Design a protein with these regions (language model features):
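Helical "lid/coupling" subdomains associated with nucleotide-phosphate turnover
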Residues: 1-202, 206-211, 222-229, 235-238
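Short proline/glycine- and acidic-rich turn/helix-capping motifs at secondary-structure junctions
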Residues: 262-268
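Generic structural signal for residues in well-ordered beta-strands
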Residues: 55, 258-261
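Low-complexity, glycine/alanine/valine/leucine- and proline-rich hydrophobic stretches
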Residues: 210, 214-259
Length: 268
């Protein structure tokens, strides 16, 4: 650990020396001395951009990073780190910042991914789109923190104004559109992937319209031209059924299958 002042002072000293002098003074090979100053310049630029006060020097260097990147691109080694989980954790923080209803969000997210998985042969979307669907479920109500009456537009603006590390600009825009169109009409030129994800999110969100998680045990199954949503819940789900109709109609327009809710009846 060293201060940025110490680092910049040391960098200025080394910058006046030749390659041979650096190799001798620091007891490194000539090859290592060759890249020392360019690397120091990169670190110096990072310090200027970030504005940090201290610099922690790990046991790895830029050469290790270059070698790692090359090996991964050639499938020589596999990185076991789950970068998707990093993105999910970051979005959890965004949701928390805008006072999202955690229980409702997690329930809608669970329903959405179940629908995605059971219909994967129909929509043909990838794991990356599945991740965007999860993120949309986690942020679908963030705009309510700013405005209840204009929540969809506020949600869109929040997402577009927030840099989410791990998502490209196009993916972030796709995420923002799915969240926006969850409750508002779509533009005619809307991307097909956005339409497919929005159809799933609308159905999942409608299944917890009361925010009381009445259908905890629901299961999803494709039968002929229907997406059957079965539940043994003893709760009154009249609200969910009533507000489910138009969401189901849109889903049917997109996928050609009709979502139907089937609640097991209990003898009183």
């Amino acid at each position: 650990l060293m201060t940025t002042e110490d680092f910049m002072g040391r960098y200025k000293q080394l910058n006046t020396k030749s390659q041979d002098e650096l190799a001798k003074e620091l007891q490194v090979t000539s090859e290592q001395a060759t890249i020392l100053i360019p690397c120091a310049r990169i670190y110096g630029r990072f310090i200027e951009v970030v504005g940090c006060k201290n610099l922690w020097v790990p046991g790895t260097d830029i050469c290790d990073g270059v070698a790692m990147d090359y090996a991964m691109s050639r499938k020589k080694i596999m990185d076991k780190h789950n970068f998707d989980e990093d993105i999910l954790n970051e979005v959890r923080g965004i949701s928390k910042r805008y006072k999202g209803n955690t229980v409702h969000i997690q329930f809608v997210r669970s329903l959405a991914v179940q629908i995605f998985d059971v219909t994967k042969k129909i929509h043909g979307l990838s794991k990356r789109e599945r991740l965007i669907l999860e993120l949309a479920a986690m942020l679908h109500d963030c705009g309510k923190y700013i405005s209840i009456h204009n929540a969809a537009e506020c949600s869109y603006n929040i997402i577009m104004a927030t840099e989410i590390i791990g998502l490209s600009h196009r993916e972030r825009e796709m995420l923002a559109q799915v969240v926006k169109y969850n409750t508002t009409p779509m533009e005619p030129e809307t991307d097909l992937t956005v339409i497919k994800l929005t159809a799933i999110l609308r159905v999942a969100n409608a299944l917890d319209r009361s925010h009381k998680q009445k259908m905890q045990d629901c299961r999803f199954e494709l039968k002929d031209s229907e997406l059957v949503i079965s539940t043994k819940s003893k709760e009154d789900i009249a609200l969910e059924k009533g507000l489910f109709v138009d969401k189901a109609e849109f889903f049917e327009e997109v996928y050609g299958i009709k979502p139907v809710i089937r609640q097991k009846k209990f003898n009183v």
